[in-house]
UniProtKB/Swiss-Prot annotation:
Organism annotation: Staphylococcus haemolyticus (strain JCSC1435)
Protein's recorded name: Probable dual-specificity RNA methyltransferase RlmN
Principal place of residence: cytoplasm
Binding site for [4Fe-4S] cluster: 127, 131, 134
Chain residues that bind S-adenosyl-L-methionine: 177-178, 209, 232-234, 308
Amino acid sequence: MITTEKKKKNKFLPDFEKQSIYSLRYDEMQEWLVEHGQQKFRAKQIFEWLYQKRVDSIDDMTNLSKDLRQVLKDNFAMTTLTTVVKQESKDGTIKFLFELQDGYTIETVLMRHDYGNSVCVTTQVGCRIGCTFCASTLGGLKRNLEAGEIVSQVLTVQKALDATDERVSQIVIMGIGEPFENYDEMMDFLRIVNDDNSLNIGARHITVSTSGIIPRIYDFAEEDIQINFAVSLHAAKDEIRSKLMPINRAYHVDKLMEAIKYYQEKTNRRVTFEYGLFGGVNDQLEHARDLAHLIKDLNCHVNLIPVNHVPERNYVKTPKDDIFKFEKELKRLGINATIRREQGSDIDAACGQLRAKERQVETR
């Protein structure tokens, strides 16, 4: 729930007149109902309308009294996302550009796999981490998203899938923004979509990725939720990583590894390292050996990413043969590694690219 105290802690949260009803966890909805003279069991009815029947209006919650519906309308907004652009790839990937109620835009991606449908969600409008290969950072950070705005991304995609009787089975928090810079809202989002009264998406079917905000890695290690954890690494040496990811100047690789080791000691869970391959920068066999040496004592997996070209950035794709050689070298050194399947290569698939293109149109 967005309280005054939470807004003070998170200065980048929006100051809307009404909170999104989707921002409330199940326990918070129960608490709110009791505080307003209602019975606790109404929370189950409300969540069923929101997440199973997926109604668009509080007035559609017909088994609630008119008085309760009015109280809900007086206090909460039904967050709606307006689809500005929808791009569909020949491989079935769909990229949405959504407009928020204050006019800002965000991206959400639906990816189709043999094992189900995965949604990549955004946690911030823009990003201030400044990764030099990423379109998300163009224009900087505008604000954080409420938990309800993150939930609404999944719900909006799920409503689109309802027409073909499909469901969202996996969530990856790898869209625009640094999730650990919007930590409390991200955690509320995770608990909402994981709740069996809500979308009931299993914790092990959800992955959160960070650029390496070390204090929050320690916090995340203490959370009682079995979410998959990924770290955008991209280089094993500080010199290269600092050029790719300026955040590394604050959180050096050795300190990042200490935090990850702590996370594994606390959770006994595997970590995925995301490693984007940039031609002539971090894609040589010596870089593979540096990486293997850095992570050899960790329970981990390396996800090698053939990067999407971003016109505003100067990096180039590593040739396919070199990608395979890099993977082979890691495996030779005992590291579990795979090459991520490229999806959406014929649309604006790079993170933040579609939003950046729309911003260019707006400013012409």
